[in-house]
Every structure is written in C-alpha cells, then in structure tokens.
C-alpha cells in the first residue's frame, strides 16, 4: 500500500474516495470542525452527513462537541477558513481507500441517508444507551435547544422519566419504545431496583411524572395508580415493609388524595407481609403512627373489626370495602394493638404470628383460640427445662395482658384460660407451682366437671405409667402429687378419696408380691384392673401362707381396697369400718382355723374384737358368733381345750338371750367331755398319745358328744386353777394338767355350780365360795 504525504494544499488534490475516507476519519476522531469543512468539499446531502455521524461518531462523545454540527447548513460550528488550517494527514492511496470504503458499503453504492435531524436525535440517543448505558449523554443530546421540537417535547416527558430511571437500572430505549411505553414498562424497570434509599425519588420524580404526562384522562390516571399500588403491595410481600415505611414517613410532596391511597397500601402491607420480626413490627408501628398523625386519627375500640373474617388477598386488602385497610381510627388502632401483642409474644420467646394471623386468630372460634393459647404456653416453656412458680406466674401475667389488648383470646373466658394453665401445669408436672397458683388461676372456681376431668387425666397419665408400687417413688409419687393439687376442690373430693385409696392400696399390697396375671409383674395398673377387695385378699392368703398373721396390714389394705373400689360410704365412716373389720376378722379367723392356728384366732378375738365390743353393743353379737365358732372348732392345737373353753365363755358372755341356752349347753358338755378325755390321755403312754393325738381328736369328732360329755361330767374337778374362769381374767387359760378326781357330789349340782359361776363372770357376779 502506497501512502502520500500531503503538502500544505494537499486537500484539493485528494480523490473522491480519499476525501470520503478522510471525512470518516475526522468524524471518528471527533474533529467535527474539520469534518464539516471536508463535507463541504463533497457532493453529499444533509441526510448523508447525519448518517455518517450516526455511524462513526463515538457514542461516548460529549454532546456539546457535536451538537453544533448536527445541522450542517446552520451557521453554528466553526469551519476552518482555509485548507492550511487543516493539518496534513497521511491517507492510503486511492485504491486502498476505495477497498476500505467498499468493505464499509460506502463506495460504489448509494450512501445511507437519514430522513431528518429528529431521526438522528432519536437513533443516536438510542445507540448511546444501547452501547454505553450512558443515558445521561443521550439525555443531554435530546434536551438541547437546537433539538427539533418533537424531540424536546419527548425529552421533557417520557425520556426524562427514563433518563432519571437510568440512574438505578439499565434502560434499553429508543424513541419509538419510549413513546409506546406504559406504566407497566416503567414499573417493570423501576420496582426491581426500588429500595428505601431511592423509593421516594422514583415514586415522586419517575412514577408520578410518567403517569401525569402519559394522559389527561382521570380514569386512565386512576387505573395507572391502581396498578402501581398493586405492584407496590406485591413488592412488600417479597422485600418487606422498608420501602412502604420510607414512603409513608418521607414522601412529603405527595398529594393528599394519593396519600390516602398510599396509607391504604401501607396498612395492607402490614397484613400481607410474612415477616413478624421485631424489625418489621417496629416498621409497622412507625407506619401506623405516621398515618394517625398525618390524618389526625385517634385510638378507639376496634372490636367491631374482629367480628367477621377478612379477605387477605392483594385485591381484597386493596378493596374499598375492606375496613381493615381503609385508613381510619379503627384500622390504625387495631394495627397498633397487634404490634404491642407481637412484641409481648417476642418477649416470651414465642414465635410471633404475622399481622394477618393475629387478626385471623382474634376472629376465630373458641376451639381455635384455645389451641393457640396452648401453643403459646408450649412454646414459651420450650426453653425452660423445669418451670417454677415465677415462670408460670410471669406467663399467666402475660396472658392477662393479652386479654386487656382485646386480641387473640376474645372468645375465651378467664375460667377457660385457667383450665388451659391447669392442664399445662399438670402436663409439665409443675405441682408445687400449681399449688402456689391455685388462688391466682381460680382453681376452685373452675367448672366441677372440668376439674374432675383434669384430675383423672393427669392422675392416670402417671398412675398407669408407674411400674413401682411404692407411692413415695416414681410415677406413683407423681400421681399422689396430682391428688394433692386438688385438695381444696370440693367437687373432686369423692374422686380424690377413691384414687388416693387406690394409691395406698398399691403401696400396701406391694410386700405380698402377688401374681395377679401369669407372666406379668405386679403394677398399679394391674391392681386397678383386678380391683375386687375380697378376691385380692383371698389371693394374698392363698399365695402367702403366713399372711393371715399380718392382721393389721391386711385390714388396712382391705379398707383401702374397698375405698378404691367405691364400696365405702363416707357419710357412715364408723359403720363402714366396722363392716370391713368384721368381715376381715371373719376371714382371718376362717383362714386361721383352716390352718389349725386356733391360738391366733383366739388372739384376734381378744386383741381386736373384744376391744370393739367394749365400744359398741352392736359388735357383741358378732363377738358371740366368732367366739362360738372358735369354741366349737375341733383343733389339734396343744392348747385347743383351754382356748376353746375361753372362747365358749366369751360366747356365753356376749350371746343374745335366745342363744344363751345353746351356748351354755355346748360349753357344759364340752367341759365335761374334756374331763373324760383328760383321764384317758393320762392313762396312755405319752409317746403313743403324741402320735395318736390327731386320730383321737378325729375319733372324738365322730363320737356322740352328748354321751362323752355326760361321762366327762362325772370326772369334773374342783381344782382351784379352774377358778380363773370366774375371776374374769380373759388372757389366762385353763390348765390341761389338772388331776381328775372322782367325787360323790351330785353331778347336777356341780354342773349348776359351774354354769352359775360362769354366768356370774358374764354378768359380773362374784363366784360362789
């Protein structure tokens, strides 16, 4: 390639292609005065000039540098006076210039041409924005005074909006696009970058300007603003309340009518937001206070707003019929109370509900509010391992404050709240704290049926989980504590007595190690499932051979079993105790006699039954029956004779008049028969006697007692040791070692003497001398 170095008048010697190539080079290098001079040397149109500027002028060029040269025919722009003022430029030769121009499609073809300057302004401003994102340069181009009228008008409206918006977001625009832009286009560009720092500027300088310049139709303007508010509400759902908070507090140039709309959006924003953090709550409180101050609202009773459900959709919240978001003293008062309630829940370390949820709970029915209260308590206690009185007291105080706020628990009475606390404290096994708070939560004022249900539920929760039978340990001890909580609650007295006796029975039955069901260890639940007093006592006697000797323990157990089974009339305590005692004495003596332990049977009569007989005339007949039964029992016990005689004398002493002859007759015959037996035993070898003792008694049992006792009567002795019968010493025994003597004394006289003196003991008459 050959290049020519031009001299001082080199320009006029250039070929057409070299001049065009030079013109392009000058435009590219932003040398517009020189370019305008060269253009004058070429036979090109104004449209060609504008086309070359559009194509080759760098987009980053300061508009002030080329604006004077856009109108090539105007007097604006400094044209060099002479060719000498143009510095020589080294250009390619003609052939090379033509080749390069051909590649740029500027040679051997029709040059591109723009229609007019307005087209250049539009296209070059678009090119600036698309290539550099420097919208401000395009804005400077279109706002200058030399721009065509249509460009200036467009710049003052639509392009101003996009120019201002370009500070925050990329704005790909051209004249056609800007002219066709709608509020949707502006919002789609503006809202993604909207934040608390730029929201006032964007809403005031961009959104408002665009809507006002886009139409003069009031209906269209209203529709555009409705779209803005709806999109702003959607933005809150994803980005939070910060933007709305800033707008309400700092958008001071907003028109009063628009502020009412903004206030509605702000109130709706609080309900549509899913964030209930302290930060969001503080923003909501600021928003509400600002609306109250600017619109002169006051705090009022908002109860009417919570009497019906509300639509929390975006359209529902922005509806003119929605009283919840329509700016008023009612709506702002409610929102302020919700902020206080959420703050209280946050202090309790409870997950705070959203504003929407708070209203929904407050409008809900009794069951829903109870469930929410239970969740509040559970969450509040979630971080406390063993809540004490202070924890429960503070929690109860918080709930009372909620009631004062008229939120959440509107349909729950004080008693219902007390019941929830009662159940939860029982569940947490905070028995000591519950006893301390009985008056505070009004335990005694709770409905009786509810009290009983709570008692049963909590008691059996622990009782049926118990494996240990000791009432002072484990789950059984907890069951006792449940009963202790309700000690002052009169409606529960019958149930408490029965359940307390059930616990006592479990503890008393433990030492006997019963097997109630094969393969199952003894447990409180098993005792309850087999709660039949007679059956249990008999099972103890059958599985524990010596259990009948533990009379006091068995009696105590039997009493508790009857109480636990509901077979005990507390209005007649002494009657019931006597009934159970008589039954137990009968059962114990029956078992004793079955085991031929007549001595223990005698002990029961003397130590237990006679004491009862002294205190009650009604027991004497029972004493007679028992003593007579023992007296007639054919025992093989070594002291059987003495014991039986003692028992027969006790029977005589307590027999009713109609039974007295029978007992006396039996006692007389038995005593006489005993003398014959004594004589026979003394004439027999001792060892033989010992080995045959049981057989002899069996033979005696089968013999004719009347005949034997008649023979024995002849052998009755007047031994002084027999006088113990008449001295009234109930703890002494007749000796079996008396020596029988034969006397000529009339048998009738002796029997009469014995009988008379025996009755004397019964009647308190001294014996005959």
Curated annotation (Swiss-Prot):
Membrane topology: Peripheral membrane protein
Keyword Transport: yes
Subcellular localization(s) per the UniProt record: Endoplasmic reticulum membrane
GO BP of this protein: intracellular protein transport; retrograde vesicle-mediated transport, Golgi to endoplasmic reticulum
Protein's name in the database: Protein transport protein sec39
Superkingdom per UniProt: Eukaryota
Pfam families with a match to the protein in the record: Sec39 (PF08314)
Keywords: Endoplasmic reticulum, ER-Golgi transport, Membrane, Protein transport, Transport
Organism: Schizosaccharomyces pombe (strain 972 / ATCC 24843)
């Amino acid at each position: 390639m050959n290049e020519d170095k031009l001299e001082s008048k080199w320009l006029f010697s250039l070929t057409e292609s070299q001049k065009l190539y030079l013109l392009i080079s000058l435009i590219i290098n932003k040398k517009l005065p020189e370019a305008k001079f060269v253009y004058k040397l070429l036979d090109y149109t104004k449209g060609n000039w504008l086309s070359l500027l559009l194509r080759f002028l760098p987009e980053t060029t300061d508009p002030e540098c080329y604006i004077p040269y856009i109108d090539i025919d105007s007097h604006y722009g400094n044209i060099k006076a002479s060719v000498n003022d143009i510095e020589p430029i080294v250009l390619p030769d003609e052939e090379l210039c033509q080749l390069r121009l051909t590649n740029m499609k500027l040679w051997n073809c029709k040059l591109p041409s723009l229609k007019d300057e307005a087209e250049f302004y539009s296209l070059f401003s678009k090119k600036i924005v698309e290539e550099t994102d420097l919208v401000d340069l395009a804005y400077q181009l279109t706002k200058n005074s030399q721009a065509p009228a249509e460009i200036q008008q467009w710049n003052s409206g639509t392009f101003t909006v996009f120019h201002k918006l370009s500070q925050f977001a990329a704005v790909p625009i051209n004249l056609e696009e800007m002219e066709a832009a709608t509020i949707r286009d502006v919002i789609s560009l503006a809202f993604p970058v909207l934040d608390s720092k730029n929201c006032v500027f964007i809403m005031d300088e961009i959104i408002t300007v665009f809507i006002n310049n886009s139409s003069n139709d009031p209906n269209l303007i209203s529709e555009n603003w409705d779209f803005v508010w709806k999109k702003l509400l959607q933005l809150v759902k994803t980005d939070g309340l910060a933007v709305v908070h800033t707008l309400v507090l700092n958008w001071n140039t907003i028109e009063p009518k628009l502020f009412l709309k903004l206030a509605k959006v702000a109130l709706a924003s609080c309900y549509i937001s899913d964030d209930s953090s302290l930060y969001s709550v503080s923003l909501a409180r600021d928003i509400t206070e600002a609306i109250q101050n600017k619109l002169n609202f006051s705090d009022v009773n908002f109860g009417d707003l919570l009497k019906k459900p509300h639509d929390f959709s975006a359209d529902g919240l922005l509806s003119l019929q929605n009283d919840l978001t329509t700016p008023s003293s009612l709506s702002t008062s409610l929102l302020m109370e919700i902020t206080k309630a959420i703050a209280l829940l946050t202090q309790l370390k409870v997950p705070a509900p959203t504003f929407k949820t708070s209203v929904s709970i407050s409008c809900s029915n009794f069951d829903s509010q109870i469930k929410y209260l239970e969740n509040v308590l559970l969450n509040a206690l979630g971080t406390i391992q063993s809540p004490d009185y202070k924890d429960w007291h503070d929690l109860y105080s918080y709930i009372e404050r909620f009631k004062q706020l008229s939120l959440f628990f509107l349909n729950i009475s004080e008693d219902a709240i007390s019941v929830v606390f009662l159940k939860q404290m029982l569940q947490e096994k905070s028995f000591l704290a519950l006893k301390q708070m009985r008056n505070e939560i009004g335990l005694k004022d709770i409905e009786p049926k509810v009290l009983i249900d709570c008692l049963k539920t909590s008691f059996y929760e622990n009782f049926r989980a118990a494996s240990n039978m000791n009432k002072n340990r484990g789950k059984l001890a907890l069951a006792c504590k449940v009963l202790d909580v309700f000690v002052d609650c009169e409606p529960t007295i019958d149930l408490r007595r029965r359940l307390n006796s059930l616990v006592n029975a479990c503890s008393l039955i433990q030492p006997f190690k019963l097997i109630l069901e094969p393969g199952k260890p003894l447990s409180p639940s098993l005792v309850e499932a087999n709660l039949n007093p007679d059956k249990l006592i008999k099972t103890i006697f059958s599985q524990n051979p010596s259990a009948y000797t533990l009379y006091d323990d068995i009696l105590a157990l039997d009493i508790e079993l009857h109480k636990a089974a509901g077979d005990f009339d507390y209005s007649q305590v002494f009657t019931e105790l006597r009934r159970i005692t008589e039954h137990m004495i009968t059962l114990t003596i029956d078992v004793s006699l079955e085991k031929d332990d007549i001595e223990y049977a005698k002990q029961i009569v003397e130590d237990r039954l006679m004491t009862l007989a002294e205190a009650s005339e009604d027991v004497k007949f029972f004493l007679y029956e028992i003593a007579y039964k023992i007296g007639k029992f054919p025992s093989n016990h070594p002291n059987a004779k003495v014991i039986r005689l003692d028992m027969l004398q006790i029977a005589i002493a307590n027999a009713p008049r109609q039974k007295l002859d029978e007992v006396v007759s039996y006692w007389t015959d038995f005593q006489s028969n005993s003398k014959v037996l004594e004589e026979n035993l003394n004439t027999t070898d001792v060892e033989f006697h010992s080995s045959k003792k049981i057989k002899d008694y069996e033979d005696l049992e089968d013999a004719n007692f009347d005949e034997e006792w008649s023979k024995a009567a002849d052998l009755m002795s007047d031994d002084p040791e027999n006088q113990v019968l008449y001295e009234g010493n109930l703890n002494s025994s007749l000796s079996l070692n008396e020596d029988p003597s034969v006397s000529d004394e009339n048998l009738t006289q002796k029997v009469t003497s014995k009988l008379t003196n025996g009755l004397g003991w019964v009647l308190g008459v001294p014996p005959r001398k």
